[in-house]
């Protein structure tokens, strides 16, 4: 039993020695001490387990808080997005209503146009029918006149039937019914074109209506989704309640939304300006089309005028000939009447009486001839007037039809533009749906993470409740046991000393733990702050992911636009294929007709060889086609641009996808790094919380856990509501995802179809070449047919000459006809020369129009570039603002982390190393992706080159086909002309034969009449020889008159034939002109369509280029710092303002070409633009003020943290004072106890041992005091770090104040007084913020003074403790060696304390230096305020001198230079501050290492020989920790210095890029100005050409108007003359009266 007791006692002593208790132990107190030791061990183990559980729960709660914060931020973001969607829906609804109104008006206009075209169609048909009827009547009249002339010549009609016009002895012959009139081909073509246009407009109207219905349905669906989303958000908002963070985020989102709305307003104003410019361009195109139509009309009118002039000259010559014949007949009549009167007066023989009836018969015949010729003359005049009226009516109808066609084309163009706008809106809605789908997916993933965390936390909460119950039970058990210990100590005096020592040790440990509780709570607060920083980093990653998803959405939109473009190109290819098939059918149809045109084919072969030579000499087949058709050159350029745009779009899509993948990988890696950091933090928390051994802290933590559990339960409910909402959104977005996948598959198939289309085009090209060869053979056959037709015409001419040779009396008329033909040929040559000159003028006008069109295209491209630049600027501003906010958040987080995370440097270094490795991996991945992108780009370039080659081949084939079609049309026209000429020759030959037969009949009739006269003369020859001679003379004259009459009739017939041929030629020319007009109209329409397509492709290319540049800017901006971003933003704001002024000036310059009535509208728009710019400046200043307010709030939080720390230090100082007082009282009690025990029970050696135990207690107390001094030093260092952070914040605020002053001075120079007031308000706000910072700095200085006082009190307490130890040592015994050693060690401790005081004084000196630096910063701030006031005064003066534009520009440049210098000064100050901080850091680190070494030496000297090994181990552990901490801290600072240098380099690079951008913009503006001048010159030339064309048209219409007047006025005198002649004849004849004169 004794052995067991001894063994148990030995084991217990070893345990007590392990616990640091070396006093002797009696066997009587064995059980009690063993029980106490077991309870202590059990309590320690339980406390450790509870502490670990609490740490785990705290970590879980922190993680849950982080996730809850992210969920809140997502909720705020969704609310902001909802508000944006509301704005978009309102805008979309307004746009939809506007489009609906425009569509309704367009439909009404189209209906009116269709009705008007239908009316004009019917009117034209009726006019054509009436014209054909009149023509048939005139032909019938001509035929009747010809037949009447033939009857008169043949003698079938008597003079009585001709002379009177009322009565006739012979019955009137009924003419055969005329053939039905045949409408002209030109009229039929015009009607067909009008019908086709009406049908196309109806189809377009139906398509537009269907698209409008579809858009309305989509808008309704979007509105329903948004409404459901609003309801869900409102429900969640009512359940979750409001939070300060939510309110702050709402305010920030409202500011962002205001900025976005302002930028949207700027973009809308620029877009409105662009639309106005496009309207001006459309107006110019309409004027060009009108000019071309006017030129064509002028050519047609000139041609018709020349024809009418030729007809008028021919009719005039015929009228003159008829007048001469009429005068000769009248003279002959008068002479015959005189002779008859003389014969009647002197005749007395029966022979004379017998010859008188014959003479009267001849006289009546001559009078009938005169009357007939007068009637023919009047009919010819009437026909000429009718032809003139018909010509004017047709001309007016043609003008009306052309005007209606132009108006219909313009309306169709407007409808197509509206359709394009609707398509763009549909694409935008699809992009928004895709963005919403991505957000829903993100919310779903976050909800899943939150649910898993909630489940884990619920399990942890249950375990925590169990552990808390166990800890409470153990605490109660411990209290009970402590009571038992106290009772046993009172009953057992023998073990009182050991019990008191154990209790005092436990009390000291509890006090130490309580003292360290505040420090641990501060560390916990620091860790919470770090968690907040991590959450902020997560928010940044989320924002980066959202921006990446936005880029992906834009890429999808670009892909959608590319798909639409490919669809349009496929449609165009289908149209080309249909046109090719139609052409092939036309060629096959013409194959049978061109079998006889061999001679024409030879000429066409030569032309084809020349064209092939030109095509072989040129670089592209499109140039030759452009020279021949003057319209197809833009097609090759458009195809090349389309290929380039396709390559760019594919590259942009690939880059966007690669960037999205890269950003997703970066986000995932960031999440992994965050997880590693969280693990490191958890490990650090476990290590820190291993030192907590107090029950009170456990209970406090348990209370905190309960509060957090309640908050977690609330957050769990909110998360469940979020989960329900996210699930509902996910179900709604599933359909959208499926539709987007289908669209992607369709795009892939469309790309494959494009490749197959290119191959099909190549095949069609070879088919077209074969068709061209077949057409050449057909042309050869047509040439043979033309030769045969010419041979037939030559034969007809030979027959005509033979007929002329047979009729001797027609020789003179034939010569006159030849003379007329020569005159006609001369007129034709003159007309050809005039036509050539007009063609040259037309070509020059076409060149002018082409130059104007090129200028307009350049202007359009410039406007689109400006629009792209503005869009790019807006996107860059938004990105910069987002990056600025993120960077400001990062900066504040970094400062707080640098101030609070000194103890967690090792984990941060590991995380930094892991991040570096991840960054290297990302760089390698980026390099690999760049290589893949280069390979893909190379493949795309190769494919694009092949596509361009194929497109060039296709363009060449199309040009060849169109050339072949043109040549075929010319051949058809020539063939038709040859046929008409052949028919005319045959008709003329038939007319000659008829005339010859009539002449032979008249000759036979005259010969018979001559025989009768000879018989009568032979009967009376014996008595009236003189009368016979006179009768012979009269007979000869009558024969001459009859010959003249016959010749006049023949001439009338010939003129009728020529008139018919002229009419046929006129119809052929009109048909050819109509064909040419249709061809030119088709070419013009195709050209306009191609121009529209080119413009659309250019705009799409610009949008893609803008998207690519925005992506590149975003990638580069991720590596920039806050100062670089701020400087770049300020510089860009100034550039944007200058650019807006340049845009305004350019718009004003462009608007000078418009009408004077629009001047007021332009001024109003300029004023509105200035007001918007002023509002933008005001909003920018407000944003700066809000940013300063947020910074001030962050400084307030930092000051509050400092104050809390100061309060903690004060409380710790108070606790130290209390401990010192307690220690003094306990020392006194121990001294009394020792004296009593010395006097009563113990020996001197036992007293010396007791004194050694008390010395050990004092050593422990001194160690605790030194630890407290070290904690105070740490707090002093933390305060210094916080002061340094405040100094950095002040320097940053100083830089921002400088940048704000520069931006304010640059932006307010050209603005209104309201902007100046806003700037002054912002300056006042900034001054107030700086004053507030100054007051806070003073408060921080006061707190530092208080802390120094607390440190002095702590040092005094340490000194008193050392004095107490020194006093207690002699009381133990003067002869003891331990007392001497203790005195030496206490003296060393005092010396070390003195050194620590010197170090504290050094720190105080450093604080004074910092105060001096703060005073210098205040001085600089006052200087900046003075500079700001000076700038405000300068702005006021500039507002007064607003008219001086040059001075304003110089001041702006000066302000830019000042801002640059200030930025450089700020950079230098930042570098100097960084170097100063680095030097201070090195000094502080050296001092700290020295203090640690001294402290370790002090500990080793105090503990003595017995504890040298343990002290050495502790010193080694502390030394290694300090060295590692110092090295890591140094590496972190070096990393920060490197980051600052990198930021400086980035700032310099951004400044250089900005300057280069400014230079490029100035060059672009100079080029734009030059092109604008060239455009003005071209427009002036075009206006002059239009004026000249209008003047020439007026001149043409003037003669054309006078000619009908002359034609109408010319016949007036002729009847008068005929009447006069008639009356003269009557008076000359005595009793003879003409029936034509008096009866009329």
From Swiss-Prot:
Phenotype of the disrupted gene, per the record: Basal body-defective and flagella-less phenotypes due to disorganized mitotic spindles, reduced rootlet microtubule bundles and cytoplasmic microtubules, and associated with abnormal cell division and slow growth. Heterogeneous cell size as a result of unequal mitotic cell division.
GO MF: identical protein binding; microtubule binding; protein homodimerization activity
Biased composition (Pro residues): 174-183
Biased composition (Gly residues): 1619-1631
Major localization class: cytoplasm
Low complexity biased stretches: 1592-1618
Matching Gene3D superfamilies: 1.10.287.1490
Keywords: Coiled coil, Cytoplasm, Cytoskeleton, Microtubule
InterPro entries: Centriole_BasalBody_StrucProt
Site (Microtubule binding): 101, 108
Keyword Coiled coil: yes
Region (Homodimerization) residue spans: 11-64
Subcellular location: Cytoplasm, Cytoskeleton, Microtubule organizing center, Centrosome, Centriole
Function: Microtubule-binding protein essential for cytoskeletal organization (e.g. rootlet microtubule bundles) and flagellar basal body/centriole assembly.
Name of this protein: Basal body protein 10
Species of provenance: Chlamydomonas reinhardtii (Chlamydomonas smithii)
Taxonomic lineage: Eukaryota, Viridiplantae, Chlorophyta, core chlorophytes, Chlorophyceae
Gene for this chain: BLD10
